[in-house]
Amino acid sequence: MAQEYTVEQLNHGRKVYDFMRWDYWAFGISGLLLIAAIVIMGVRGFNWGLDFTGGTVIEITLEKPAEIDVMRDALQKAGFEEPMLQNFGSSHDIMVRMPPAEGETGGQVLGSQVLKVINESTNQNAAVKRIEFVGPSVGADLAQTGAMALMAALLSILVYVGFRFEWRLAAGVVIALAHDVIITLGILSLFHIEIDLTIVASLMSVIGYSLNDSIVVSDRIRENFRKIRRGTPYEIFNVSLTQTLHRTLITSGTTLMVILMLYLFGGPVLEGFSLTMLIGVSIGTASSIYVASALALKLGMKREHMLQQKVEKEGADQPSILP
């Protein structure tokens, strides 16, 4: 008669959380969120920023540093819609981005009007350094390039994880990453948050962060499949997730605190980036457990899939952790 064991014995006597017990609930919630995100994106679309729609960029040199918020408020009160201001180079140089102006003459007129408002609001004699018009065609190219970059990243991850681990884990990881990006985009669309190049950068960062979480869990699953001889795949997945839970919570918690500080104190320039990261990291932390891992288990992940493809003598591999 085979010796009975408890799942805690597989984890050296420590408590094991039954994560996989809630896999169908997790799949259901994730599925509803994905459908909702896709519908929202289809109905509301995106609030594309000047990086994608085109616009006028005006570089202005100030006599002395001035508050960005003061100049932005003055421009809005003067009737300019959605002006984007940021320092570049030094505290005396600012860049103003405005919606498209018709032709070169329109850009020059717009530059003069913006300069007048800034001079009046700061009580100084600033000068226009450069005026540049970015056409909609350039913005469309940027949008296409950004989408291709996201797709290339997901494809590269699929190839790497499939080679490094196993295709079932690779499928779970890539689906989880796509899940994170789609839901994040759905939330951005829902709240009509402006999509610019910093948002694309934050989405790439979310993919990288979520991938790191999933790789850590996948590596522990592979290690435990080789070390733990008596556990079922269900038990080994739960043991692996329990063992990496502390690391996941600490890493995600500290990361979210830093991003929250960026959101609260980073100003309008970093607001979209930090908000996207807050949403994506939160979703990615959950998906690394309840999408990537649970999906790999549902795809039939077994011990033999993780072991080296060679004939080994019984007991020649790492010894069981059970007596």
From Swiss-Prot:
Consequence of gene disruption: Disruption of both secD and SecF confers cold-sensitive growth (strain secD1(Cs)).
Designated name of the protein: Protein translocase subunit SecF
Stretches that traverse the bilayer: 23-43, 143-163, 171-191, 197-217, 248-270, 281-301
HAMAP family: SecF_B (MF_01464_B)
Main localisation: membrane
Subunit and partners: Part of the prokaryotic protein translocation apparatus which is comprised of SecA, SecB, SecD, SecE, SecF, SecG and SecY. The SecDF-YidC-YajC translocase forms a supercomplex with SecYEG, called the holo-translocon (HTL). The stoichiometry of the super complex may be SecYEG:YidC:SecDF 4:3:1, YajC is in the reconstituted complex (with SecDF) but as no antibody is available it could not be quantified.
Gene3D superfamilies in the cross-refs: Multidrug efflux transporter AcrB transmembrane domain (1.20.1640.10)
Entry keyword Disulfide bond: no
Compartments where located: Cell inner membrane
Organism, as annotated: Escherichia coli (strain K12)
Keywords: Cell inner membrane, Cell membrane, Membrane, Protein transport, Translocation, Transmembrane, Transmembrane helix, Transport
Single Gene Ontology BP annotation: protein transport
Outcome, altering residue 213 to M: Abolishes protein translocation
Family: Belongs to the SecD/SecF family. SecF subfamily.
Molecular function via GO: protein-transporting ATPase activity
Superkingdom per UniProt: Bacteria
Residue ranges that the UniProt entry lists as topological domain Cytoplasmic: 1-22, 164-170, 218-247, 302-323
